[in-house]
């Protein structure tokens, strides 16, 4: 099986697909699957951009809306995770995973699927210690704080992934596992990105939860993005001989190293995305403790999943493990017509409803972030006695902002020298 790996998509689907098709023509081959490591930007219309953590002057519709509307269809099956520049309102609709457009599958905030017999897991978002122990309290419309915190990784989702026992072939994360630079050419990386040096030397560059998952899951491959550079490493796990090949890739821009093709052993095709039995059993077991408020949540003890797994297996066999079909929940962007503001903030996605019905679980995604009860009042209008944070207190966790500052400094030095 030939798999294309892409770093940060930033909504530029057209160019990524064209690049892959060019590769196929040159090498007279067929790529079976595209994996994207976050910052996918599944923006369906103008209103979605209000949930995108990008400075307003840089917000663009890009090309995903064409695939959402059906004007275009992804030429290659595509699986993606979320990063820190996403239409977070749409990804919340698909918290458990699902088709974001025809032939384009979102793994969820955490998730595992099979493509053929290749098992692929992933964790969306980036690590921020402040919100790691919180529940998923954010709801659209987001404010200056929640538009950032909504994509911060939560312990709940990590603990679900930590329950996995069956081997994974591939794992995707947006930010890198902390310490991964010890296993590759860190000196070359620091020459390329000198402002990473302090974090590399202090071993704070990257995600602590991702490092825990790397140690536990030991996938054959681990792919990341976020830091906008290509970096390879190989992690030897103990004495059992298992090795994880790590690769981070850049964003989709001319001259950037944003794409890599790998070949992985697999059964012969045709291939399709399928639900993973073990993962859905874990999802079913953990849903009763799904944390939906700010307060600290300890989710480390959820018990065995065996009984849940047997129940899930019977249900999945009835539908041959196939995910539910893609369904649009809001109008797609139309260059000649404005989207109406009457679109609900949190539409109930039919895929999510169908999956929860299959698993015998309640729908909780429109619950109040304060009480955990369902409400039609937007979270931003709900009363709360919890502290609010000034924007200056919020740490910079966006690599784009860091790069912009460094490029500005470089420009200043150039002007000074001129």
UniProtKB/Swiss-Prot annotation:
Q: Where is this region: Disordered?
A: 372-418
Q: InterPro entries this protein is in?
A: Calcineurin-like_PHP_ApaH, DBR1_C, Dbr1_N, Metallo-depent_PP-like
Compartments where located: Nucleus
Q: What class of enzyme is it?
A: hydrolase
Q: Where does a divalent metal cation 2 bind?
A: 39, 84, 174, 226
Tissue expr: Widely expressed. Expressed in roots, stems, cauline and rosette leaves, flower buds and siliques.
- According to the UniProt record, where is the region Lariat recognition loop? 124-154
The record, for Pfam families, names: DBR1, Metallophos
Q: Which family does it belong to?
A: Belongs to the lariat debranching enzyme family.
Q: What is the official name of this protein in its record?
A: Lariat debranching enzyme
Q: Which organism is it from?
A: Arabidopsis thaliana (Mouse-ear cress)
């Amino acid at each position: 099986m030939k798999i294309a790996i892409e770093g940060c998509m930033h909504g530029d689907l057209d160019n990524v697909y064209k690049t892959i098709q060019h590769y196929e023509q040159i090498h007279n081959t067929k790529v079976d699957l595209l994996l994207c490591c976050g910052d996918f930007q599944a923006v369906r219309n103008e209103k979605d951009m209000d949930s995108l953590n990008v400075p307003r002057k840089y917000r663009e519709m890009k090309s995903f809306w064409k695939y959402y509307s059906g004007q275009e269809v992804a030429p290659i099956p595509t699986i993606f995770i979320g990063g820190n520049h996403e239409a977070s309102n749409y990804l919340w609709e698909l918290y458990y995973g699902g088709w974001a457009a025809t032939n384009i599958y979102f793994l969820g905030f955490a998730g595992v699927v099979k493509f053929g017999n290749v098992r692929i897991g992933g964790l969306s978002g980036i690590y921020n210690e402040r919100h790691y122990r919180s529940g998923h309290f954010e709801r659209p419309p987001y404010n200056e704080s929640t538009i950032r915190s909504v994509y911060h990784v939560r312990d709940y989702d990590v603990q679900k992934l930590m329950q996995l026992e069956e081997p994974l072939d591939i794992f995707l994360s947006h930010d890198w596992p902390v310490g991964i630079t010890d296993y590759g050419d860190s000196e070359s990386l620091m020459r390329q990105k000198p402002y990473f040096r302090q974090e590399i030397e202090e071993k704070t560059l990257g995600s602590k939860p991702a490092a825990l998952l790397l140690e536990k899951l030991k996938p054959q491959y681990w792919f990341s993005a976020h830091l906008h550079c290509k970096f390879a490493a190989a992690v030897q796990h103990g004495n059992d001989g298992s090795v994880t090949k790590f690769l981070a890739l850049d964003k989709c821009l001319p001259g950037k190293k944003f794409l890599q093709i790998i070949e992985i052993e697999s059964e012969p095709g045709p291939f399709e995305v399928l639900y993973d039995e073990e993962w859905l059993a874990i999802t079913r077991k953990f849903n009763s403790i799904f944390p939906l408020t700010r307060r600290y949540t300890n989710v480390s003890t959820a018990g065995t999943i065996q009984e849940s797994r047997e129940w899930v297996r019977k249900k999945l066999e009835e539908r041959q493990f196939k995910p539910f079909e893609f369904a649009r929940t809001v109008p797609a962007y139309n260059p000649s017509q404005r989207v109406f503001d009457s679109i609900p903030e949190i539409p109930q996605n039919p895929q999510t409803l169908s999956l929860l019905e299959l698993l015998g679980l309640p729908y909780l995604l429109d619950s109040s972030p304060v009480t955990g009860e369902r409400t039609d009042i937007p979270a931003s209008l709900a009363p709360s006695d919890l502290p609010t944070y000034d924007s200056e207190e919020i740490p910079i966790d966006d690599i784009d902002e860091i790069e912009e500052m460094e490029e500005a400094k470089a420009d200043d030095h150039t002007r000074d020298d001129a």
